[in-house]
Each structure stands twice: as structure tokens, then as C-alpha cells.
């Protein structure tokens, strides 16, 4: 299991309004922009901007991450061997595959394995 990248989640009211500020802070355009369920997301540097209806914010705040890994299945095997529990997934998304795991300390973490195209686009 290799961690390739982590993001700080930031909840914003409007992605189109917030995105230019974070692109300016980072000094680069967004690496990714996509919809997921009721949310619209953009990855800029090490920030993951999330815009969603107020009623859905708590659902997205309940987990930490995403933690981008090289191999989701291997990561799940390693984590469950240390008493982590899969609480959701693995699922397929626009960027690859993901799963939610609860660590023995109670932390709920989202793990993502990017598709080869997304990995190449973001990491080079």
C-alpha cells in the first residue's frame, strides 16, 4: 500500500466562485473537476473543494480524506488485517474506485485508487 496523495477537504457554497481563489493560491488550474452524487468537486493542488446542498454537507464531513492509494484492494487487505472495517464499497466513480474504512481508533477514512488516466493527469 503506497499513499500517493492526500487532500484537505474544503466545503464551499459555489464551486465556480471559489475555484479561482484556490487556483490563485496554488498557482495552477484544477487537476480535476467532476460531479459525485449531489456534490460538485474540484481538486486544486492539495485542496479538494466540495460544493453541495446544505442538507448533504454532514454526509461528506463524516469521513476523512480522500487518501489516494496505488492499489485499493491491497490497501483494504492491509487495513483490515490491522482491525479496520470496510464500511462502504469498493465502489466505482468517475475518477476510479473508492472505499470507506473505519480504523480501530474510530476514524472513518475514504481511500481512492485513481484510474490510470486520472493518475497520469494529476501525478504525471
Task: Please state what every model-predicted region is.
Residues 15, 36, 93-95:
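Short strand-connecting beta-turns/loops that link adjacent beta-strands
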Residues 16-25, 99:
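Conserved active-site alpha-helix within GNAT-family acetyltransferase domains
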Residues 26-34, 85-90:
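Short secondary-structure junctions
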Residues 1-19, 63-65, 115-124:
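N-terminal beta-strand motif that seeds the catalytic metal site of vicinal oxygen chelate
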Residues 17, 74-76, 110, 120:
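Intrinsically disordered, low-complexity acidic/polar segments
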Residues 5-13, 41-43, 55-124, ...:
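Vicinal oxygen chelate
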Residues 28-62, 108-115:
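Conserved short beta-strand elements that form part of the metal-binding/catalytic scaffold
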Amino acid at each position: 500500500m503506497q499513499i500517493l496523495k492526500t487532500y484537505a477537504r474544503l466545503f464551499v457554497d459555489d464551486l465556480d466562485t471559489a475555484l479561482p481563489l484556490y487556483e490563485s493560491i496554488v498557482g495552477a488550474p484544477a487537476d480535476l473537476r467532476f460531479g459525485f452524487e449531489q456534490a460538485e468537486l474540484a481538486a486544486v493542488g492539495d485542496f479538494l473543494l466540495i460544493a453541495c446542498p446544505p442538507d448533504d454537507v454532514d454526509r461528506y464531513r463524516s469521513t476523512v480524506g480522500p487518501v489516494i492509494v496505488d492499489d485499493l484492494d491491497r490497501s483494504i487487505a492491509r487495513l483490515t488485517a490491522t482491525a479496520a472495517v470496510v464500511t462502504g464499497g469498493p465502489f466505482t466513480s468517475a475518477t476510479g474506485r473508492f472505499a470507506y474504512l473505519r480504523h480501530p481508533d474510530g476514524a472513518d477514512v475514504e481511500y481512492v485508487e485513481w484510474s490510470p488516466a486520472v493518475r497520469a493527469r494529476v501525478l504525471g
